Design a protein with these regions (language model features):
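Well-ordered alpha-helical scaffold segments within catalytic/enzyme domains
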Residues: 80-96, 143-158, 200-214
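Aromatic- and histidine-enriched alpha-helix N-cap/loop-to-helix transition segments
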Residues: 70-84, 135-146, 192-203
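Low-complexity, Ser/Thr/Pro/Gly-enriched N-terminal "stalk/linker" regions
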Residues: 16-131, 158-181
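Short amphipathic alpha-helical segments at helix-loop
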Residues: 67, 129, 152, 189-190, ...
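Bacterial Sec-dependent N-terminal signal peptides
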Residues: 1-22
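Surface-exposed, active-site-proximal loop segments in enzymatic domains
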Residues: 122-136, 153, 193
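Extended ligand-binding clefts on enzyme/binding-domain cores
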Residues: 23, 27-52, 157, 166, ...
């Protein structure tokens, strides 16, 4: 009987833990989200800093053309991370976080470049004019496109769907038949075709198919999938390689 009571007590505690876990995860998410918006947001621009405190401006090494020092606001890659988290929070609790999502949509347009066709998101906001030329990365645009199609799933605003489609058009403009297809990392440079650019393009394409039912996006998604498996999959390990180096 004693063993039975202990067993039942253990099961009851386990059940309580299972019930509390989602609330615990959401509580942690709310706290982390609030910390980012309180400490990283740059109110005068409606953007976010690369680091906290914003006075810390080290060299950043995730660029194709070498290092760049952190600036007044973050580059596009970290900014997309904030966008992604905001979409998920708005999906979980629209009443609380939908205004944050609306704010993010406005902020992302600071990175939108209409001086080059197709239009796309560049690595740093155009308002600051800190660089002679700001690169546009296919993988970053893939992230932003995924953010927009996920935003559309929350808002049902057709403008967000159109934005995702437009970004996909830009990414697809980088596809060429060298080495059987694929897109590079950076616009205008053909030295590599990485998993990050092509994998995100595949995800965006399949999400567009899911949202629209258009078979075109399914076929393009399959094309990216086949290229990744044919070109980047290591048959000995089953692992996708980082990139196909084209040396051109």
């Amino acid at each position: 009987m004693k063993k039975t009571i202990i067993l039942l007590s253990t099961l009851a505690l386990a059940a309580c833990g299972q019930n509390e876990a989602p609330d615990s995860y959401m509580s942690n998410a709310r706290e982390s989200f609030q910390n980012v918006w309180e400490h990283y947001r740059v109110p005068e621009y409606g953007l976010f800093s690369e680091y906290y405190p914003n006075t810390f401006k080290p060299d950043l090494n995730y660029f194709d053309d070498g290092t760049h020092q952190a600036q007044e606001s973050s580059f596009l890659w970290p900014m997309s991370g904030v966008f992604s988290s905001t979409v998920l929070m708005a999906k979980a609790d629209p009443g609380t976080y939908r205004p944050y999502l609306d704010s993010m949509v406005v902020a992302m347009e600071e990175y939108y470049d209409t001086t080059r066709v197709p239009f796309a998101y560049q690595a740093y906001p155009s308002r600051f004019d800190r660089f002679d030329r700001v690169d546009r990365y296919y993988d970053d645009n893939g992230l932003v496109g995924i953010d927009y199609i996920d935003t559309y799933a929350v808002t049902k605003n057709p403008a967000h769907l159109e934005k995702a489609k437009q970004i996909f058009t830009y990414i697809l403009s980088g596809w060429d038949d060298r080495f059987g297809g694929g897109v590079p990392w950076v616009e205008g440079k053909r030295d590599q075709k990485p998993a990050c650019s092509n994998g995100k393009a595949m995800v965006l394409s399949l999400k567009l198919h899911e949202a629209t039912g258009d078979e075109y996006y399914l076929e393009i998604g399959k094309r990216f999938y086949r290229w990744i498996r044919r070109t980047l999959l290591d048959p000995n390990t089953g692992i996708i390689m980082n990139a196909w180096l084209t040396d051109g």
